[in-house]
Amino acid sequence: MKHLDYLTGIFLLPGILTVPASAESIIWGGHTKYQLSQTRYDDDSLFSSVATSPATDQTLDFRLKAQKYWGSPWDATFHYQLLGLHGDTLVASRSLAVSPFRLNTGAISDQQRLFDLTSVISERDDRILLHRIDRLSLGYSGEQFVARAGRHIVSWGNGLIYSPMDFFNPFDPAAIDKSYKTGDDMFYTQWLTQRGNDLQGVLVPRREPASGNVSSDQSSLVFKYHAAADLTEYDLLAARHYDDSIMGGGLAFDWRGSVIRSDLISTYSDRDLTMAFVASTSYAWSWLNRNISGLLEYYYNGFGQADGDYSVAALTTNTALLARISRGELFTLGRNYLAAGATIEITPLTILTPTLFTNLDDGSALLQLLLNYDIKQDFNLLAGFTLPIGPTGTEYGGIPSRIPGIFLSPGSALFAKLSWHF
């Protein structure tokens, strides 16, 4: 079935992109990205016992894009991906039964999606090469109605770093490359009013992991209303997501030159009501003829550990948190977080971005520094490091494993990514 779905996607492509001779030509594009990284783990880290420290990894990401517009209002989109990983982290992740691509290149499994459009080309202990279809959709865009069916993406919410309202393949807050979200098989609609407000609806069917059958308990149906009044924009959301009922709202407005954003999400599951909240302020200014923007964001995760006990034994009892982490919806273990960041224009071609992610409950933090340099047109270099801060027993210092004196601790990492866009 897996290979049949993949081949079906390939064979459907010519039909979707083939149009009458009078139509415009296909718009092609894409990128090739190569990343080299090295991660150093402490001696008491569980990763040190199953992998070389420092761990050296290489990743390859090739994406070919095709988009077709014909007449008005039809369009079609296709993205092909070739993904490769080679290195010590893959060996360690397999030894610890952790998905390597969840750690390095984002979610790639199509196990629960309606169509399995991912196929492994080759695989060994320290390497894997696979290809997949990440976008394959047909769209209609009228004056007041928009519809799209197929593999596509949706991004919602006002969170700039933490995104509780964006539960369709959100980015890890500490991800260094946020160019492309992973696509989902969905049906999307949007109704636009004369005043500029809109109502969006998304249906994402998913399969049961065990049986492979499409199930309503694994699927999502979401509606979001967006409107603007004076200088304030607001959102209202209602969803059935897996077996949860979700209600939410968000605001965004200008205040004395800064932009204030916030989202509040309530999840009703197993007779429990759980809240999530994010609020941020961002401000831009010029200093010494350099453009600078700053960001401060608070995040509350009601699914996180309330008592600050992040041991493996304690986490296994928090099934709601672990389920959302395994689905790629949550990336934190605690409840209260503060992120502070800035974007500094060193030169028009060089951007420096320092960010500090802090767990307010245990005081641990993750420091990230990114340097983005445009070498020339279509060529880009992204380099930097991440440094966990905190004592053992904390989220970023290292959570206790089941082995006494051994911790699941993140390592300090150096990385460089070279990108070519075409």
Predicted feature residues:
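Membrane-embedded beta-strand positions of outer-membrane beta-barrel proteins
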Residues: 30-32, 78, 149, 189, ...
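Residues that define the transmembrane beta-barrel architecture of outer-membrane proteins
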Residues: 54-60, 129-134, 141, 181-185, ...
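Residues on the lipid-exposed face of transmembrane beta-strands in outer-membrane beta-barrel proteins
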Residues: 62-68, 135-141, 187-191, 223-227, ...
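Outer membrane beta-barrel
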Residues: 67, 74-198, 204, 390
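Detector for outer-membrane/organellar transmembrane beta-barrel domains
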Residues: 258-261, 265-357
